[in-house]
Regions:
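Iron-sulfur-cluster electron-transfer modules
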Residues: 1-43, 48-55, 59, 64-65, ...
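Short, contiguous acidic/charged loop-to-helix segments that flank catalytic cores in large enzymes
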Residues: 19-21, 151-155, 175, 180-186, ...
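Phosphate-binding active sites in nucleotide-utilizing proteins
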Residues: 31, 164, 171-172, 184, ...
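Conserved short loop/turn motifs at secondary-structure junctions
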Residues: 47-51, 79, 180-183
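Short cysteine/histidine-rich metal-coordination sites, predominantly Zn2+-binding motifs
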Residues: 180-183, 204-213, 243-253
Length: 282
C-alpha cells in the first residue's frame, strides 16, 4: 500500500485494516466482515506469512459464502509475489467482478468473540442462513476442515466411553440415547478410537446444511431389558449380550473355577443392581 501511494497508482476504494500478522486472521474474522456490511475482503500477506494457514481460512470463507448463494468474495494476495502495479491491477480486477453484497444493509448481529471459536463460527453461518434464507446443500466429503459425521451401530452398549471423551459435547447421553450435534464435532477421532465395541464410525465431511441446524440427532437408542425381579428397565440388550459372552469366554479360560459358576453369574446378570444383592445371598 505504501508503494502504491508513493507511485500515485490508482486503485479501488478500500478500507485498510492492519493486523500484527495475517496469520492471526481466521475464517471467523473474514465472515464477520460480511456481517458488518463488506462487499468483499482482500487479504495481503507478506513473505513471512504461513500461506497454507490463511489459504485454508480463505477457502472455507469462500465456500461458506457460496453455500448461501453469495459467491466467492474473498481474495488473497501474497506480498512476495507482486509489486505495486500488480497489486493495484489485481485489486481492481477483483473489485470489478464484485457485486454489492445482498446482506450488506441488513441488521447487524453483535458477535461475542470471547466465546469458543467454533461457537462463533456456527453463529456466523447461522446468521448467513437467516439473512439469505438459503438452505445450503454444499457438501465436501473427505474435507480438510475439522468437521465429521459420526455413526454408531447396534454393537453399542451405552458404556459412556465416547461421551466421556468428547470435549466439545458433540456427543452426549440422555437416558439410554446417545445424541450427536454435527456442528460441535471437530473430527478428533477420540470417540472412534475409544469405543471398546468398535461400534463408532467417523467420516470427515463438511456439510453446510447441517451447520445451520441447532438441534442434534439421536445416533443410537438401544432396547433396554427389564429386571427379572422388580421389572425395572436397567440395561441395554447389547450390553447384556456382550457381558454374557465375556462371562462364557472367561469360563473357558479359568476352567470354571470361582465362587459362583458362570450359570449363577448369568442368572444374577438378569437382575438390576438393587435386586442383585439380595438375590446373591438367597
Amino acid at each position: 500500500l505504501n508503494a502504491v501511494g508513493r507511485k500515485k497508482i490508482k486503485y479501488p476504494a478500500l478500507l485498510p485494516l492492519f493486523v500484527p500478522c495475517i496469520d492471526l486472521v481466521s475464517e471467523t474474522h473474514i465472515l464477520n466482515a460480511f456481517e458488518l456490511g463488506a462487499d468483499g475482503v482482500i487479504l495481503l500477506g507478506c513473505e513471512n506469512s504461513h500461506l497454507e494457514q490463511i489459504e485454508t481460512a480463505v477457502k472455507f470463507a469462500n465456500m461458506a459464502l457460496s453455500a448461501f448463494d453469495l459467491g466467492e468474495r474473498v481474495f488473497l494476495i501474497s506480498d512476495g509475489q507482486c509489486d505495486a502495479e500488480d497489486f493495484a491491477k489485481e485489486t481492481a480486477d477483483f473489485v470489478k467482478e464484485l457485486s454489492p453484497s445482498p446482506i450488506r444493509n441488513m441488521k447487524r448481529e453483535k458477535i461475542d468473540f470471547t466465546k469458543p471459536k467454533r461457537d462463533v463460527l456456527l453463529e456466523l453461518i447461522q446468521n448467513l442462513h437467516k439473512k439469505t434464507k438459503v438452505h445450503p446443500s454444499l457438501i465436501e466429503e473427505n474435507t480438510q476442515f475439522p468437521f465429521a459425521d459420526v455413526a454408531i451401530d447396534s454393537k453399542c452398549t451405552i458404556c459412556n466411553a465416547c461421551v466421556n471423551l468428547c470435549s466439545t459435547n458433540a456427543l452426549s447421553k440422555e437416558g439410554n440415547k446417545v445424541n450427536f450435534v454435527y456442528g460441535n464435532c471437530i473430527a478428533c477421532g477420540l470417540c472412534e478410537r475409544a469405543c471398546p465395541e468398535e461400534a463408532i464410525t467417523l467420516e470427515s465431511a463438511l456439510d453446510f446444511s447441517r451447520l445451520v441446524e441447532k438441534e442434534g440427532k439421536t445416533l443410537v437408542e438401544p432396547e433396554l431389558i427389564a429386571c427379572a425381579g422388580c421389572g425395572k428397565l436397567f440395561m441395554s440388550r447389547s450390553a447384556f449380550e456382550r457381558i454374557s459372552e465375556l462371562l462364557k469366554e472367561r469360563e473357558g479360560d479359568s476352567g470354571g473355577k470361582g465362587e459362583l459358576s458362570v450359570e449363577e453369574q448369568l442368572e444374577l446378570l438378569r437382575y438390576c443392581e438393587d435386586c442383585r444383592a439380595s438375590k446373591a445371598v438367597e
